[in-house]
Amino acid sequence: MQKLKQQVFEANMDLPRYGLVTFTWGNVSAIDRERGLVVIKPSGVAYETMKADDMVVVDMSGKVVEGEYRPSSDTATHLELYRRYPSLGGIVHTHSTHATAWAQAGLAIPALGTTHADYFFGDIPCTRGLSEEEVQGEYELNTGKVIIETLGNAEPLHTPGIVVYQHGPFAWGKDAHDAVHNAVVMEEVAKMAWIARSINPQLNHIDSFLMNKHFMRKHGPNAYYGQK
């Protein structure tokens, strides 16, 4: 697990490097599907002092199997998403400014241009609010459940992120690095959408044919963007 712990540590350290977190407001995890184990950031540990060996290993029930610290308080959310979506290899949660602003506004981040379409096949959805019972009960687990409810039958790697109403963004990918990459993109397109709608409040969504072209040339069966 040492290699995966190092990868998760590096991915967590990318959050402050890319300006996605303040203090300890974020976490990254990754899963070893063969072993059924997840590596995740320890709860409340400052990035300035954190080391790879501080990463916490938990099983799919959330039991700590390796590590000196308690795992992130959002662990149950991560585990619920891993259980539901076998294609996920890494998950990120932050309170990045612009994506969180859309979450607090209760609005999906609209797909307005090709930067968005290169990564997200449509709007980045916003969940419904959790009920008082859901919050007072198994809050973090129910956060995962409301994300799954909102995604429905969507392919999660075609919609590699979401904003949870009144909370903040979650992003995911094929591994921890990919999940952080998608979290960075989500923050950037959230900022772009806010600016664009401020300039033109009547701005329409990106044309569907342009959306399809940009997403499929990177992610479709005949993708040709980048190097093989």
UniProtKB/Swiss-Prot annotation:
For molecular function, the Gene Ontology terms on record are:
aldehyde-lyase activity; L-ribulose-phosphate 4-epimerase activity; zinc ion binding
Q: Name one GO cellular component term.
A: cytosol
Catalyses which reaction(s): L-ribulose 5-phosphate = D-xylulose 5-phosphate
Q: What induces it?
A: Induced by L-ascorbate. Repressed by UlaR.
Q: In which pathway does it act?
A: Cofactor degradation; L-ascorbate degradation; D-xylulose 5-phosphate from L-ascorbate: step 4/4
Q: Does the keyword Transcription apply?
A: no
Which UniProt keywords are given for this protein, alphabetically ordered? Carbohydrate metabolism, Isomerase, Metal-binding, Zinc
Q: Where along this sequence does the record place binding of substrate?
A: G26, N27, S43, G44, S72, S73
Record bears the keyword Membrane: no
Q: Which SMART domains match?
A: Aldolase_II (SM01007)
Describe the family membership recorded for this protein in Swiss-Prot or TrEMBL: Belongs to the aldolase class II family. AraD/FucA subfamily.
Q: Give the protein's recorded name.
A: L-ribulose-5-phosphate 4-epimerase UlaF
Identify the species of origin: Escherichia coli (strain 55989 / EAEC)
Gene for this protein?
Answer: ulaF
